Amino acid sequence: MKYIGAHVSASGGVENAVLRAVEIGANAFALFTKNQRQWKAPALKADTIEKFKRFCKAHQFSPEHILPHDSYLINLGNPEAENLAKSREAFIDEMERANQLGLKLLNFHPGAHLNKISESECLARIAESINIAVDKVPNVIAVIENTAGQGSNLGYRFEHLAEIIDQVEDKNRVGVCLDTCHLFSAGYDISSLESCEQTFSEFERTVGFQYLRGMHLNGSKTPLGSRVDRHHTLREGTIGTDFCKFIMQDDRFDNIPLILETIQPEIWTEEIKFLRTLAK
């Protein structure tokens, strides 16, 4: 079965994200559990946690289909010791928040070397950051998102994801989220059914579908291999819609959250319906 939703607002409290997901006809969703542009946030209140869990149960959202995203400020591969420690502390807090809400996944961008350390050194720091976090917080899987490769961000090659996973001690506590806009911008062609087959076969060989815990379904405003991260709606932009058909008709993408981060929230309901029409 396909679980489709969007990254909905948690404004006014995380429990409201559940209701916003219901409004757009979703059976999966993503959210921030705190302000994503601040390092620190007030602790989640007991009544907020209770409401979130109650609303999820009432609307039949299971933890495997909810994909919280961490703060954009966090860089788990930071070359500077002080900033790395700050990022790790913030990431552990994000993991704890997800765990308090009964969630099983935490989606994050791997990190950037800032042109101060080598790629392999940065990837090793990211893996070490995951090891530290999962050692401190139980239950939650660290879900690495592939990137567009903008600036010095790593994670734009499948080999980067594999190198991080290889250095994570508990393989049950690490996973991957593939963003279609990022894939295309990083140079992985998904504009036809044939190119999708090639790209996802390469993912299987390099990383493995056993690690795929979620996807972000986005169109792109920029051409193949641009290394620029600019999302578009599903049916506009440079990729086309064959990738949507491929994903909706391939059972390797069953039972994971398929999340829209497309640029017009007012058409999310229609985009979800469109995806459902493509399913077998």
From Swiss-Prot:
CDD domains: AP2Ec
Pfam family for this entry, one: AP_endonuc_2
Positions of Zn(2+) 3 binding: 182, 229, 231
Residues engaged in binding Zn(2+) 2: 145, 179, 216, 261
EC identifiers of the protein: 3.1.21.2
Entry note: cofactor: Binds 3 Zn(2+) ions.
Binding positions for Zn(2+) 1 per the UniProt entry: 69, 109, 145
GO MF assignments: deoxyribonuclease IV (phage-T4-induced) activity; DNA binding; DNA-(apurinic or apyrimidinic site) endonuclease activity; phosphoric diester hydrolase activity; zinc ion binding
UniProt keyword terms in alphabetical order: DNA damage, DNA repair, Endonuclease, Hydrolase, Metal-binding, Nuclease, Zinc
Family note: Belongs to the AP endonuclease 2 family.
Protein name: Probable endonuclease 4
Organism: Actinobacillus pleuropneumoniae serotype 3 (strain JL03)
Protein encoded by which gene: nfo
